[in-house]
């Protein structure tokens, strides 16, 4: 907050200006320009076209964007700091809420880091890896559907918005049946998953894939060759390979330059090397190319999910080492709150040593050897990386997320400066930022 004293016309006046970062320099530069030619406009943080609480500081001349800056931090939640006060397993509940449109990717990246520090990456059961891939690819479909639905809505295409959200409900219903929650389920755990798939899960997933085909086809029929849609997106938000490399851009934006960069292929994890799928690219470098990549990636994700159903074999859903395995067979009591009498009897009926170990595991958590690792997964928005540091205790010393939304937002100026204000809406929609991941 800055106080500016002004004595225009002999009357003293104090103006309080709320600013952040280089906001004052932006205002000073605008004031020094010729009067009536350029104005500074705040687009957001409460604006329907900024995908959340994103603030865009625009300097415009007529309808042309001369300068564009991003103002972030309005959704800061302190998740990374909170992780330092929670056990390693409890951290999953926090990280799943970062990028809230792709929670399974947040959870998987975190768990892969913990498992790498523990040195148990190769001990993860095969069924666990298949379930993780299954959930991530279903999550990729639901995330892309939101990107296309909201992007269409912002450009005036209301029907694709209804189609996209209706299709997303199919996926979220699956998540609820498998994990108990539609979003932020904390289902992926270090060493495995919280619980096995329900008995009829494979049948329901296969049926959901059949239901998804119609809305995906309908989305393509509505937009792929739509003249208005192409006019609003082709040649808009242009960013070539050189710009992407300079800014560290990943995901559909990078692949729209023709570079087939996908961590599922270049640095496989969770057994992705055993799945057949194509890395979708485009060479248009614009918003339309990114749209087409997301449309085609949903079909590739469906292919991967079908392969997951074929690979599902009976087996454990948690590592066998009981010193590390979080109790994953909890049963809810008849009141829906506490543990069931059957589960309590199982714990209390075991040996005293087993009971003590169970108590210490739940109340103190596991100890992770000292060290630091970096792991990354290919999220719907690009490279989601985790830098994890352990001091040998039961809590993380530091966990830092490299969220693709944060990095990709750096391209707003390169995409939008020199273009029209209306085209800025399409450019930001093609970036598909999620502010929960940006601010954390």
From Swiss-Prot:
Stored HAMAP family: NDH1_NuoD
Highest taxon in the source lineage: Bacteria
Keyword ATP-binding (UniProt): no
InterPro entries for the chain: NADH_Q_OxRdtase_suD (IPR001135), NADH_UbQ_OxRdtase_49kDa_CS (IPR014029), NDH1_su_D/H (IPR022885), NiFe-Hase_large (IPR029014)
Main localization of the protein described in the UniProt heading: membrane
GO CC entries: plasma membrane
Entry keyword set: Acetylation, Cell membrane, Membrane, NAD, Quinone, Translocase, Transport
Subunit composition and interactions: NDH-1 is composed of 14 different subunits. Subunits NuoB, C, D, E, F, and G constitute the peripheral sector of the complex.
GO MF entries: NAD binding; NADH:ubiquinone reductase (non-electrogenic) activity; quinone binding
Source organism per UniProt: Mycobacterium tuberculosis (strain ATCC 25618 / H37Rv)
Catalysed reactions listed for this entry: a quinone + NADH + 5 H(+)(in) = a quinol + NAD(+) + 4 H(+)(out)
Protein topology in the membrane: Peripheral membrane protein
Intracellular or extracellular location(s): Cell membrane
Function per UniProt: NDH-1 shuttles electrons from NADH, via FMN and iron-sulfur (Fe-S) centers, to quinones in the respiratory chain. The immediate electron acceptor for the enzyme in this species is believed to be a menaquinone. Couples the redox reaction to proton translocation (for every two electrons transferred, four hydrogen ions are translocated across the cytoplasmic membrane), and thus conserves the redox energy in a proton gradient.
Sites bearing N-acetylthreonine, chain numbering: 2
SUPFAM superfamilies given in the database record: HydB/Nqo4-like
Name of the featured protein: NADH-quinone oxidoreductase subunit D
PANTHER family per UniProt: NADH DEHYDROGENASE [UBIQUINONE] IRON-SULFUR PROTEIN 2, MITOCHONDRIAL, NADH-UBIQUINONE OXIDOREDUCTASE 49 KDA SUBUNIT
PROSITE patterns linked to this entry: COMPLEX1_49K
EC class of the enzyme, as a word: translocase
Keyword Transport attached: yes
EC number: 7.1.1.-
